[in-house]
Amino acid sequence: INRKKMKVIITGACAVSARSVLRSLKMSPLFESTEFVGWDMCNLLYGVYEGIFDRIYKVPAVSDVSYRAVVEDILNKEKPDAVIVVPEVEVLYWSEYTFDVPYIVPPKEFSKLVISKERLFDALKDTRLVPKHITLTVNEIEDPSFINPLGFPVWIRDGAAGTASGKGAFKATCYDDLKAWVKINQGIMQFQLSEFLPGGNYGCFCLFKKGKLIKIAQAERIEYIMAKVAISGVTGNTSKGRLLNDELIKNTALDAISRLCQITGEEMNGLVVVDMKGDTNNIPIITE
């Protein structure tokens, strides 16, 4: 093992996920002498002043035309040994527009497909790997003649690409619930309805290199951080969970990844997190 002093940049440094990644790395003796640098849009100032990074740079959004020039200046200055790209929209950018630094992300077309729940679900709709679903505009839901083909209860959430952590999510038990939720969330123009899955909440973490599965881990999310502040109870990261070793969860995740790579014609690289919820029989169904 090369124990030289390394420098690692972690993107999305102010958000919960990137900070969790850093805390995990710092628990390993392999990284005890590593210098950790972050960058972020810095909207969440707590992440700036928490102090777990050696330093943090403020960068524009990935959609900003100046993004590439700003991060290339940082890369040229810091000369990192590796970059860990965390936010989904940033992973999508780095999969399409490469940088001359060591990093590993999933392939471009795969990333474009799975960043959208609608495209992901449509790609796997002929399997039982994903829930029954439908994507609707606000006008379609508010139409007095609308009939929910999925029945109730139903899970409604923001249908835009890149949404995660239960954004705009709610368990609707009747049509009045749907209308009220649409009315409350006026900034959301498109909603996804999917069958409500009452079972366990699972994550399967699969690390690939050149098509080969290197590591795999599974966990059950039992409680979320500050769960009561979100009506869905889903706030992003867990405060309580447990590790699992379940063949069905593993096989479900790998089956979906394989099918999607066949669709895109690509070789898998990087870390893929497959989120699942158990159905009425607690059979894991992919949600993200």
PLM segments and residue spans:
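Helix N-cap/beta->alpha junction signal
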Residues: 14, 87, 116-117, 174
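Short amphipathic alpha-helix with an adjacent loop that forms part of the alpha/beta core around
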Residues: 67-77, 143-149, 183-184
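A conserved helix-loop-beta module that forms one wall/lid of the active-site cleft
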Residues: 96-169
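Conserved ATP-binding module of the ATP-grasp superfamily
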Residues: 130-133, 167-198, 257-264
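Glycine-rich phosphate-binding loop of ATP-grasp-fold ATP-dependent ligases
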Residues: 132-133, 153-181, 201-205, 225-242
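ATP-dependent carboxylate/phosphate-activation module, predominantly the ATP-grasp catalytic core
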Residues: 195-201, 205-261
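Conserved metal-phosphate-binding beta-hairpin within the catalytic cores
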Residues: 260-288
